[in-house]
Curated annotation (Swiss-Prot):
Domain free text: The BTB domain is responsible for the interaction with CUL3 while the Kelch repeat domains supposely serve to recruit the cellular substrates.
UniProt key word Repeat: yes
Source species of the chain: Vaccinia virus (strain Western Reserve) (VACV)
Protein name: Kelch repeat and BTB domain-containing protein A55
Gene Ontology MF term list: ubiquitin-like ligase-substrate adaptor activity
Gene: KBTB1
Length: 564
């Protein structure tokens, strides 16, 4: 004999003919003859059973009537070299039996089959099975499949078999695949209706209440399975006192704006949460040193340089809802670069920068309202500057740091309101080219240049400004110093990515741990190589239903948007 497969085939022939068989597995009225030695070699259960005096050495029968005959027969065939023939119908029975008999290779084969064939049609069934038999590998995979396909599953016949504990787990998960929080109450109501179970406060707590539309909150109030429970109505009556909720991962899109390494084009990238990668969704011809602002899910890019040596006054935009570029936007009042960009609920602002005529710094702030035919003057900064940090907080425009006359950095912090400019606590160090973000009621800045004289030192500093106490706090430094990085806030976390470090484009990203006050390199948000990220914006998905009047069948109307 040349190999073990030939040997096992011979031994299986002995079994089929009854030669040397010394054990018979009895299941109800069925018998399976086998060899103790072969079973013990493949099954930990049989190994212990036959070697530790659990049965008399002369005993010829083992009764396993509590197991499924066909599954035991298939597994003993498997031990004797016959491949398992797995299907969606039999794999659960075979896996449960293999787990009881402790046949490791069969367990692995069954698990791999389930993982390979998991889909929206069977994920609930496999999740319930895995939860019952405590199979964490399948439970985790099937649960993630449920999260990914939840809006398909609310009309699945197996949806009603999910327990309240499972629904709490599903509705609480950040990765629930809904693009608008209004769909979470729809999922809850569909489950309540399918089970005819009354709502509980524990289920309502899973919803991100502060993100729900008034129409959906009214729908919860009026639904009989909710309104009939006093505790639920009491909870809904007090939602004004709940903490602000953070969006789920799929309810926003992370959109980055930068310069790609492909002929240095402007590149619009979108973060794929499922693959943990950035994917380019659009690009256009080269431009750099432009300002970025986002209003109504449209990304505006103002000024900068194009392929000519001159600064530009052009404004272009990318509509994230239609995935299209917009070119018919009024030009800036004059060409400029290295300016700041901001937006409030109505206007786009272009702040400071370098003018084209003589490369002089400008202090002007211009604003434009979409649909208007021109930009208008809004205000002037106290001194001309470029490459400063800008932020919009509590209706005020904050301008911090930047490069001023003499190519030096400044540490000034000022805010602009209808009453004019107000000075605030200066930065701890003179800075420029840093990134800024408003998060949790504070202004955060990171990276850039810091130097009191010549602008040449790349910074890894991270600072936060509290407008209530008018004070700066120094946080843990970045692992990698960088200028012009992107700083963004998503899901109650801070991220920084891209920029230039030691004159080289860096594709690294870092995540801030507030409790530990430390930054860690983030492998999940690594950028495309040689990609300069100018800005990263969380874009909230919008739906036509947001402007729809409430009706008694609003949830049915909401359901019609699934898949759109």
């Amino acid at each position: 004999m040349n190999n073990s497969s030939e040997l096992i085939a011979v031994i299986n022939g002995f079994r089929n003919s009854g030669r040397f068989c010394d054990i018979s597995i009895v299941i109800n009225d069925e018998r399976i003859n086998a060899h103790k030695l072969i079973l013990s070699g493949a099954s930990e259960y049989f190994s212990i059973l036959f070697s530790n005096n659990f049965i008399d050495s002369n005993e010829y029968e083992v009764n396993l009537s509590h197991l499924d005959y066909q599954s035991v027969n298939d597994l003993i065939d498997y031990i004797y070299g016959i491949p398992l023939s797995l299907t969606n119908d039999n794999v659960k029975y075979i896996l449960s039996t293999a787990d009881f008999l402790q046949i490791g290779s069969a367990i692995t084969e069954c698990e791999n089959y389930i993982l390979k064939n998991l889909c929206s049609k069977n994920c609930i069934d496999f999740y319930i099975y895995a939860d019952k038999y405590n199979n964490k590998k399948i439970e985790s995979a099937s649960f993630n499949t449920i999260l990914q396909n939840i809006l398909r599953l609310i009309n699945d016949e197996n949806f009603k078999y999910l327990t309240e504990e499972s629904m709490i787990k599903i509705l609480s998960d950040d990765m629930l695949n809904i693009k608008n929080e209004d769909f979470a109450p729809l999922i809850l109501i569909k489950w309540l209706e399918s089970t005819q179970q009354s709502c509980t406060v524990e289920l309502l707590r899973c919803l991100r209440i502060s993100l729900l539309s008034p129409q959906v909150i009214k729908s919860l109030y009026s639904h009989q399975l909710v309104s009939s429970i006093y505790e639920c109505i009491t909870f809904l009556n007090n939602i004004a006192f709940l903490d602000e909720s953070f969006p789920r991962y799929h309810s926003i899109e992370l959109i980055s704006i930068g310069i790609s390494n492909s002929h240095d084009k402007i590149s619009i990238n979108c973060y794929n949460h499922k693959k943990n990668t950035w994917e380019m969704i659009s690009s256009r011809r080269y431009r750099c040193s432009f300002a970025v602002a986002v209003l109504d899910n449209i990304i505006y890019m103002m000024g900068g340089y194009d392929q000519s040596p001159y600064r530009s006054s052009k404004v272009i935009a990318y509509n994230t809802c239609t995935n299209s570029w917009i070119y018919d936007i009024p030009e800036l009042k004059y060409p400029r670069s290295n300016c700041g960009g901001l937006a409030d609920d109505e206007y786009i602002y272009c702040i400071g920068g370098i003018r084209d005529q003589d490369s002089s710094l400008t202090s002007s702030i211009d604003k434009w309202k979409p649909s208007k035919p021109y930009w208008q003057k809004y205000a002037k900064m106290r001194e001309p500057k470029c490459d400063m940090g800008v932020a919009m907080l509590n209706g005020l425009i904050y301008v911090m740091g930047g490069i001023v006359k003499g190519d030096t950095c400044t540490d000034a912090l000022e805010s602009l309101s209808e009453d004019g400019w107000m000075k605030h606590q200066r930065l701890p160090i003179k800075m420029s080219n840093m990134s800024t973000i408003v998060h949790d009621g504070k202004i955060y800045i990171s990276g850039g240049y810091n130097n009191s004289s010549v602008v040449n030192v790349i910074s890894n500093l991270v600072l936060s400004y509290n407008p209530i106490y008018d004070e700066w706090t120094k946080l843990s430094s970045l692992n990698i110093p960088r200028i012009n990085p992107a700083l963004w806030s998503a899901h109650n976390k801070l991220y920084v990515g891209g920029g230039i470090s030691d004159d080289v484009r860096t594709n690294t990203s870092e995540t801030y741990d507030k409790e530990k006050d430390c930054w860690t390199l983030d492998n999940g948000h690594v950028l495309p190589r040689n990609y300069i990220m100018y800005k990263c914006e969380p874009i909230k998905h919008k739906y036509p239903l947001e402007k729809t009047q409430y009706t008694n069948d609003f949830l049915k109307y909401l359901e019609s948007f699934i898949g759109s």
